[in-house]
Amino acid sequence: MTEKKERIDVHAYLAEFDDIPGTRVFTAQRARKGYNLNQFAMSLMKAENRERFKADESAYLDEWNLTPAAKAAVLARDYNAMIDEGGNVYFLSKLFSTDGKSFQFAAGSMTGMTQEEYAQMMIDGGRSPAGVRSIKGGY
């Protein structure tokens, strides 16, 4: 006879990731929340859409039924806020590419570093986990 496995509450399990400082797991809930934001970002794959966006960012964003918070995040180029609004970094890469920025630049901005500081941190082996493993535990 096989042993019956205990069911876990997937929502409680995913909530545990919120305890890791700076970690935003792209869940189904985030995907639903950010659907329009991610569709906007994907629209930037077409040159004509990039040109329309650059000509009048606010008006172009109004076509995508974004939440006010998502629109403000895009206009401010606040990638952490965009991720909080359900943005997927791989979709958002279309935005920083439209701005002529690298993935390294965007990742640096999300960690509070310049592109150069971020690059050096990665060359040096990445960020130390000390102090960034648990908000509740303080370690």
From Swiss-Prot:
Its cofactor is Fe(2+). The keyword Oxidoreductase applies. SUPFAM superfamilies: LigA subunit of an aromatic-ring-opening dioxygenase LigAB. It catalyses: 3,4-dihydroxybenzoate + O2 = 4-carboxy-2-hydroxy-cis,cis-muconate 6-semialdehyde + H(+). One of its GO terms (biological process) is catabolic process. It is an enzyme of class 1 (oxidoreductase). One of its GO terms (molecular function) is protocatechuate 4,5-dioxygenase activity. Keywords: Aromatic hydrocarbons catabolism, Dioxygenase, Iron, Oxidoreductase. InterPro entries: LigA_sf, PCA_LigA, Xdiol_dOase_LigA. It comes from the Bacteria. The keyword Cell division does not apply. Its EC number is 1.13.11.8. Responsible for the aromatic ring fission of protocatechuate. Composed of two subunits (alpha and beta) in a 1:1 ratio. This is Protocatechuate 4,5-dioxygenase alpha chain.
